[in-house]
Design a protein with these regions (language model features):
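Short glycine-enriched loops at secondary-structure junctions
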Residues: 63-66
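Mid-chain, well-packed structural core segment of small domains
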Residues: 69, 73-98
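Short, flexible, solvent-exposed loop/turn segments with mixed acidic/basic and small polar residues
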Residues: 1-2, 49, 71-76
């Protein structure tokens, strides 16, 4: 079964303010994986991947402007769980099994 071999990679968290949220994660031992912010024009977001020696990786996802679909997650709060990401050997095999 393909689904039994899923490997957890990170939690995606939608945020309205990188500095405010990232400072909390830095205070509990998280570090930036990349030196710079990653821009994703397709999703209309900026991304920061945070890593920790013992805790799950976290991807902070911030909308670039009002057209970003991420804004829907931030209507009632400045922070919201956006997604869970898993590593797979074959995306098409996972889709078939679902």
């Amino acid at each position: 079964m393909v689904l039994q071999n899923l490997k957890f990679h990170h939690i995606g968290i939608a945020v309205s303010d990188f500095e405010k949220i990232a400072s909390y994660y830095y205070s509990i031992g998280y570090k930036k994986f990349n030196k710079s912010i990653i821009r994703d024009e397709l999703q209309v977001v900026d991304l920061i991947l945070l890593i920790h020696d013992f805790h799950p990786n976290i991807e902070l996802v911030k909308p670039l402007n009002e057209r970003s679909p991420i804004n829907n997650y931030l209507k009632s709060s400045d922070v919201a769980i956006y997604h869970f990401c898993y590593e797979v050997d074959s995306f098409s095999d996972v889709i078939k099994e679902l």
